Amino acid sequence: PERGLAFDFLADAPAPDGSRGGGAAPATTVALPIGIKVVVAGGFGVGKTTFVSTVSEIEPMSTEELLTEVSAATDRLDGVEDKATTTVAMDFGRITLDPRHVLYLFGTPGQERFSFMWEELSEGALGAVVLADTRRLEASFPAVDFFERRAIGFLVAVNEFDDAHHYRPDEVRAALDLGPEVPVVLCDARVHTSGIEVLISLVHHLIKLRSSHVSEAV
């Protein structure tokens, strides 16, 4: 029932032609899938590329490049000194929820010098996943601030690295100064089912946000 509710909500998302889903398609036409855009953001090296690659049903498109000495001197590598590549534009993946709804994932670059791309990648997004690494929680603040300022619904997914201390969601919430309405979930970006659970949690969060907005408007 919850999954169906999520799909009913998504059916009201704008279609590529600007129309709304949910209605019956004319008998003489073939209904096209509704594209639902979700942004995957977070600091440098938190696992965005891994997350998109793990959950995508297609070969993900990635714009990773080798880190050079120049970029290593520019970007903060604290805690991720062994990282050899970096996303310079975006990661892209796709998940088919049902024949009518397709989820498109756009992973943002993590470095501050590429933050100008976040605006474009977030255009038209229904919601966002902010990945966090408890070894470097401060790297998550720019993404949290970005989505809060633009009133884009988001949740924080703590990517539990093997060598990181594991904190409870309420501890992460307090450290990031998040409001009680923002979900904080734990995940392993390398595990498909874990990533899918994060996305389902995001959809449920967006349903609650939409319901509260409708109630306020009545």
What are these regions (language model features)?
Residues 131-181:
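Conserved C-terminal guanine-recognition region of P-loop GTPase G domains, centered on the G4
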Residues 105-108, 128-133, 156-160, 186-188:
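Conserved beta-strand segments of the P-loop GTPase G domain that flank and frequently precede/overlap
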Residues 2-80, 94-98, 102-104:
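Conserved G1/Walker A P-loop phosphate-binding module
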Residues 87, 109-114, 135-139, 167:
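Short secondary-structure boundary/capping elements
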Residues 162-218:
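Canonical P-loop GTPase G-domain recognition
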